[in-house]
């Protein structure tokens, strides 16, 4: 379970193997209320209509809102996709939906009290 002092969650998906020199953010959703323990199918849609009340998405590194699926360049090898759930001790991050995922991460520093990461892999030949 989550730490007792959890006030909200942030969910991220990051590909550290993208050929950008800095990886690729596929999804960031933040300000998920602490009483939420799952996201519904379709939660990563661009309009965010099935996200829990109060939750917000940032643009991914393709400049789009919503989850962007795995699509490594053909022949580039195996890419890791790190799905993380961050437990925060604040109900809301002091950011707006126009900031980058890096700024979100900076604002989570000092408020993250727990984290779980599941890493999947995908390769396109």
Label each residue range with its predicted role:
Residues 1-125:
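N-terminus-centered regions that define maturation/targeting leaders and the start
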């Amino acid at each position: 379970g989550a730490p007792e002092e959890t006030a909200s969650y942030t969910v991220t998906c990051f590909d550290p193997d993208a050929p950008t020199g800095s990886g690729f953010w596929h999804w960031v959703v933040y300000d998920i209320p602490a009483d939420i323990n799952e996201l519904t199918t379709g939660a990563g849609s661009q309009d965010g209509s099935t996200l829990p009340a109060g939750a917000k998405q940032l643009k991914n590194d393709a400049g789009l809102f919503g989850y962007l699926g795995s699509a490594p360049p053909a022949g580039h090898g195996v890419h890791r996709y790190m799905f993380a759930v961050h437990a925060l001790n604040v109900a809301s991050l002091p950011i707006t939906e126009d900031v980058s995922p890096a700024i979100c991460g900076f604002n989570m520093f000092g408020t993250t009290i727990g984290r779980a990461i599941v890493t999947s892999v995908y390769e396109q030949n």
